[in-house]
Amino acid sequence: MAIIGFIGLGTMGRPMARNLIKAGHKLVVYDKYAKFDDLVSLGAEGAVSNKEVASKSEIIITMLPNSPQVKEAIIGPGGVIEGLKKGAIVVDMSSIDPDVSREVGAALEAKKTAFLDAPVSGGEPKAIEGTLSITASGDKAAFEKVKPILEKMGTSVVLAGH
């Protein structure tokens, strides 16, 4: 199984990460503001930065409050982009401004890294249940690789386009 990095462990991200751990996935987790000892006690590895998460993961998922946080976490100083492994896939599950998503995607593409924009709907109860709706856009091959992972967090997982 691929090692998954998970950045953003708030209201939505924490239960999503928990569902991945329960499904047997190895996670490396980080949140700039929230503590994540509970996830470490379930078997996740804690990281001290976005860059460290990327350096230890093959698939990096972000679930952050808004566009500025996503941009900072992925392409900002000390961000995911600085620690990427060859062949990594970045999946942003936040609901953000499409222009920021395109900017992040272009920066990752320049590093030869696949990017999926995969926002969710369903709110905290569905995040806890693992029954979110996930609508992704991006590279089809990358989507097919991460789809089994996304299916541990959602029951409706579709690729809507590139």
Question: How does the language model describe each region?
Answer:
Residues M1-S55, I59-T62, A88, M93:
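NAD(P)+-binding Rossmann beta1-loop-alpha1 motif at the extreme N-terminus of oxidoreductases
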Residues I4, S95-H162:
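Rossmann-fold dinucleotide-binding core
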Residues L9-M12, L20, L27, L64, ...:
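Generic leucine side-chain signal with a strong bias for well-ordered alpha-helical environments
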Residues G10, Y33, L64-S67, P98, ...:
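Alpha-helix N-cap/helix-start capping motif
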Residues A17-R18, S41, E72-I75, R102-G105, ...:
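Short amphipathic alpha-helical segments
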Residues D37, V70, P125-E129:
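A short acidic, helix-capping loop that chelates divalent metal ions and anchors anionic groups
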Residues N50-A114:
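Rossmann-fold NAD(P) dinucleotide-binding segment
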